[in-house]
Amino acid sequence: MMHLLADPETWVAIAFVILMGLFAYLGVHRMVLKALDHRADRIRDELAEAKRLKDEAAKVLADYKTRRASAEREAEEIVTSAKAEAERIAADAKAKMEDFVARRTKAAESKIALAEAQALADVRAAAAEAAVQAAATVLSQSVKGGLGDDLVAKGIAEVSRKLN
């Protein structure tokens, strides 16, 4: 047996057994198990939290996809509405412009016709005035005296009345 006590492995084994006994007496195994259980609980909680966060992220992603689709539809409706409104405004503007041009053309034609009529009346009046002056001159030179003056006055009045 002495021989066993001289062997260093024996002393290591004895120290190990004493250490394990001391650990058992002090309840180290319970502390280790408790720490392992605590770690397992923490890992389980972290896994549950990760699953919850994953589910929440999936819900948020689905919500954003729905919102995005809705926003795209709304934007498309706005663009369609804006195009229709622009076409309607363009058609209204074209109709108003055509109406304006037609009215301006008609007004210009009316002014031209009025100017033509006025010019014709002015020419007639000038011709009548010239004819009256010429007749007055001719009659006054050919007929002398009171009878001539009466005839000239009557003739001028009659010509003026007929020409105007």
Swiss-Prot record:
Its main location: membrane. GO terms for molecular function: proton-transporting ATP synthase activity, rotational mechanism; proton-transporting ATPase activity, rotational mechanism. InterPro entries: ATP_synth_b/b'su_bac/chlpt, ATP_synthase_B_chain. It is a single-pass membrane protein. The keyword tRNA processing does not apply. CDD domains: ATP-synt_Fo_b (cd06503). The chain crosses the membrane at residues 8-28. GO terms for cellular component: plasma membrane; proton-transporting ATP synthase complex. The keyword Nucleotide-binding does not apply. Keywords: ATP synthesis, Cell inner membrane, Cell membrane, CF(0), Hydrogen ion transport, Ion transport, Membrane, Transmembrane, Transmembrane helix, Transport. It is found in: Cell inner membrane. F(1)F(0) ATP synthase produces ATP from ADP in the presence of a proton or sodium gradient. F-type ATPases consist of two structural domains, F(1) containing the extramembraneous catalytic core and F(0) containing the membrane proton channel, linked together by a central stalk and a peripheral stalk. During catalysis, ATP synthesis in the catalytic domain of F(1) is coupled via a rotary mechanism of the central stalk subunits to proton translocation. F-type ATPases have 2 components, F(1) - the catalytic core - and F(0) - the membrane proton channel. F(1) has five subunits: alpha(3), beta(3), gamma(1), delta(1), epsilon(1). F(0) has three main subunits: a(1), b(2) and c(10-14). The alpha and beta chains form an alternating ring which encloses part of the gamma chain. F(1) is attached to F(0) by a central stalk formed by the gamma and epsilon chains, while a peripheral stalk is formed by the delta and b chains. Belongs to the ATPase B chain family. This is ATP synthase subunit b 1. It comes from Bradyrhizobium sp. (strain ORS 278). The lineage of its organism: Bacteria, Pseudomonadati, Pseudomonadota, Alphaproteobacteria, Hyphomicrobiales. The gene is atpF1.
